[in-house]
Amino acid sequence: MRWGILALGLLAVSGTSSGPDGSFGAVFFPDPAVEILTPAFQKSKGFSSEEEVTQWFDQVSIRFPNASVQRVKLGTTPRGRIMGGFRINGSNPGANPVRIWVQGALHGDEQATPDGVMHLVEMVLSDQELANRVELMVVPIANPDGYARAMRQSASGMDLNRDMMMRQGPENQMIMSVFNEFRPEVALDFHEYRPYRSDFTEIGSRGVTAYFDNMFLGSSNVNIPEVLRAEIAAYVDGAATAAAQWGYRTHAYFVPEDDRGSMRMRLGSASSRSTATNYALHNCVSALIETRGVGQGRSALKRRVHSMAIIGLAFVQKAAADPDHLRAVLDAAHRDPMGPVIELHQPIEQRRYTFIDLAKRDTASFGFATRNYAQMQPRVRRPKPKFYALDKSALTPELIRSGLLVNQETKSLNQKAMAYEVAQRTEGLGANNQRTQKVVCTQVPTTITGDFVIISMDDLPSRLWYELFEPELDNSLVRNGLIECSIGKQLPYYAIYEEIN
């Protein structure tokens, strides 16, 4: 019934304006007085096609003689499309430019994001000094098959932003291969979010719609060292300030969730399945930027694209302004001595959120119980190992295809170690309907012999190894079913707390 009320409300306010926001769209989301030259703005219908995006990048060095653009082929998608990237430098780059990764359209229905990425590139290259201080690796369409059909998922039906950890989708395998080669110091992932949701019909008398232009998703994962989380927060604050100067409204990312039949909010994130956390676990300043847009057609398109670029530019400018500070933070994060947190306490708090009330056609504030990921508190922490050692026989085809352990060496060991013995185990379904195993393990001293894949905590991405090998964590090899287990048995990998013999 509430769906019908929401639909009638939208018709009532729509007037002669286009798009779901109707007549109040121009009030709350007016377009800025700027010129944007990306492909979508050279036509009156639709968004930039993959071909138009590629042509635009091919012509960048003509429009910007100060730019050097190298096309990078990441690979070929299941539907035979080329996944393309572009490595961009200024004409006179410094000796050690800040490496910045930029991507869009990981979800194929978020169709304005490639133009946001292109407009960001325009802004960077328009400032020759800035362009010479950074090196960009740009993947404007990270899900070409989904983008061609304006569908969120990949050709195989996978949500690629729930697959960043296990990398079962070939798209993520290709992305992470180039990502790891590039080794970015800053990583930006541009998304769009849906401002009209079915659960929003339960708020207010006739439902609400989203008020914020952009929402930031950094990471509150406590296995990311605190020094890096604080640096990411500083970048987000600077970007929010830059957006506000243009009248764009920003907020930390929040989304409704069910709590035993009642609605509460989830504020922030900590999941390594998603780029925001996963890229930060690779030891870089990482943020996912959500822009109000899915289901909006071309409504407020200039505002959407420009706000993405302004936010991205703030990240680029801050990194370029003091690269020594950025690198000192990343070095401190890599050397952080804290071991893996395997159990957390997450308190519930009350917070108020601003929406656009469809009955009042004005803003309104509503209170909700909230799971605030920024307030998570470590409850159980294991010591930091020097190495993890995976029995070579456990290196399954799925694990090999993921590329997670592609650069690790194999050694014959006779070594003291701590085994993980399974004390509890339950099964369920996780992201992309994949089977999961939830376990609790105890560590047992043992001596291991044989051939093992060695993962050193001195090697990047060291904090990613926590997420993979600590079995209790939500995105571990065990939780995702890549390592089978049973109660009373030991897992086929070990933590080593001393130098290897």
PLM region spans:
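Structured catalytic-domain cores with a bias toward divalent-metal coordination
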Residues: W3, G15-N501
